């Protein structure tokens, strides 16, 4: 049986310099492209833009920030969820130099 769980705290202790941690993927038994993880945005300027073949969902765990999805830019905050359609460029950043934006992201099975 595959390891069906992951501990974010342990991942962060192993490498606290990373900005993104995969929590669940094919190594945990996810199939057909299902993936889930946490990203931490510490910068107040947008970083790398991304686009994927599948849709990507986000849930803000903590902090405040900005999201740019295609041509739409909006503020995000704790408790907020949003969806990025397949093939659409997106990026996020924090609104604070002292409090990072932490989001859960997931890719659905295709």
Give the residues covered by each predicted segment.
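Short acidic-glycine-tyrosine-enriched beta hairpin
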Residues: 71-86
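Short, conserved beta-strand element in jelly-roll/cupin
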Residues: 40-42, 51-67
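A short, N-terminal "cap"/entry segment at the start of jelly-roll beta-barrel domains
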Residues: 1-35, 48
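Ligand-binding loop in jelly-roll beta-barrel domains
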Residues: 86-110
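Short strand-coil-strand connectors
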Residues: 68-72, 97
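Short histidine-centered beta-strand/loop micro-motifs
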Residues: 25-26, 46-52, 93-95
